[in-house]
C-alpha cells in the first residue's frame, strides 16, 4: 500500500470522495476524528459503508481505525465492523506484539460468528503513540500472521511526552519523533511487514509533502498515510518505482540469475552483492503492487 487515506466514519461525502481518490487504501476512522457522543452512530455508518464498498470493482483496500483498547470502546467497534468484512483494522496506541495477539483473538472470535475465514481481516498497528510503545517496537515479529504493517504517529506521543512541539521551524520532526520513526521502521523490518510513514498535517504544502515522502522512501518505508485526497497523487508518485529504477533492478536480478551460486556480480564495472539483489527484488515487487507491467 503506497497511500492510505484517513476519512471520518461519519462523513459520507468524504468517504465517497476517498473511494475515487486513487488511494491504495481508505482508513475509515472511528478514533480521533469522532467525538465521544458520536461513536455509536459512526460505528453503524462505518459498517454500512464498508458492507457496500467491499463489493465495488477495482476498489482500494478498506481499513477501519478502531479505538484503542484502553478506551473500552474497541470491542463495540469490532462487533459493528467485522461482519461488514473490512480488509484490515488499524490498531491505535498499540504497545507491542502482545496487543496484536490480543486483537488477533478478538478478530478470530468475531470472524467465526460472522462466518468469515479465520485470518480474513488483517492488522496494521500504530506502534509509537505511547512512551511504553517505543520500548516494544521489536516485539511484533511473530505476533500474528494477520499483521501486515506498522505505522507511527507523533501527535499522541508528543502529548504524552509533554512536548511543546514535534517539528522544527522547517517542518522536520524533532529528535524524539525521529527516534519513533526509526523504531517503527526497524520494527516493521524485523516483523517482515510493511513500514508506513505517518501523515503530513500541512496538506496544502505539496513541496513539503514530497520532500517528506521522498525521505520516507529513501529510508525504507513502503507507503505513507494521508489526511486529504490532494496528498494521494504525490504519495503514489513517490512510492511508484520509476522506469529507470525498474530497469536497474531488472538488470541486477538478471545478473544474479545468470550467475547462480555467486555472492557478487559485476554490471558495467560496478560490483553488486546479495543485499543489492534483495533491494532489486523489493523494487520490482513494489512496481508490481503499483500496477506496473514489468
Language-model regions: role of each:
Residues 1-294:
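Expand to "…catalyze enediolate/carbanion chemistry for C-C bond making/breaking, isomerization
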Amino acid at each position: 500500500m503506497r497511500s492510505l487515506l484517513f476519512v471520518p466514519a461519519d462523513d459520507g461525502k468524504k468517504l465517497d470522495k476517498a473511494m475515487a481518490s486513487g488511494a491504495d487504501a481508505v482508513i475509515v476512522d472511528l478514533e480521533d476524528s469522532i467525538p465521544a457522543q458520536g461513536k455509536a452512530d459512526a460505528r453503524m455508518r462505518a459498517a454500512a459503508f464498508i458492507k457496500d464498498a467491499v463489493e465495488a470493482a477495482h476498489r482500494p483496500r478498506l481499513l477501519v481505525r478502531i479505538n484503542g483498547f484502553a478506551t473500552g470502546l474497541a470491542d463495540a467497534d469490532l462487533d459493528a465492523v467485522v461482519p461488514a468484512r473490512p480488509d484490515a483494522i488499524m490498531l491505535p496506541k498499540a504497545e507491542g506484539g502482545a496487543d496484536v495477539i490480543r486483537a488477533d483473538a478478538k478478530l478470530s472470535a468475531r470472524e467465526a460468528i460472522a462466518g468469515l475465514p479465520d485470518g480474513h481481516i488483517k492488522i496494521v498497528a500504530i506502534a509509537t503513540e505511547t512512551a511504553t510503545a517505543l520500548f516494544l517496537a521489536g516485539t511484533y515479529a511473530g505476533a500474528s500472521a494477520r499483521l501486515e504493517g506498522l505505522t507511527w504517529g507523533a501527535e499522541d506521543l508528543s502529548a504524552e511526552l509533554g512536548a511543546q512541539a514535534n517539528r522544527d521551524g522547517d517542518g522536520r520532526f524533532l529528535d524524539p519523533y525521529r527516534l519513533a520513526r526509526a523504531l517503527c521502521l526497524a520494527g516493521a523490518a524485523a516483523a517482515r511487514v510493511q513500514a508506513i510513514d505517518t501523515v503530513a498535517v500541512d496538506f496544502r504544502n505539496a513541496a513539503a509533502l514530497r520532500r517528506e515522502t521522498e525521505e520516507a522512501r529513501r529510508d525504507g518505508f513502503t507507503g505513507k498515510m494521508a489526511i486529504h485526497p490532494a496528498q494521494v497523487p504525490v504519495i503514489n508518485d513517490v512510492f511508484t518505482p520509476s522506469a529507470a529504477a525498474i530497469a536497474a533492478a531488472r538488470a541486477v536480478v538478471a545478473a544474479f540469475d545468470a550467475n547462480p551460486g555467486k555472492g557478487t556480480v559485476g554490471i558495467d564495472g560496478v560490483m553488486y552483492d546479495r543485499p543489492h539483489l534483495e533491494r532489486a527484488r523489493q523494487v520490482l515487487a513494489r512496481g508490481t503492487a503499483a500496477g506496473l507491467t514489468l
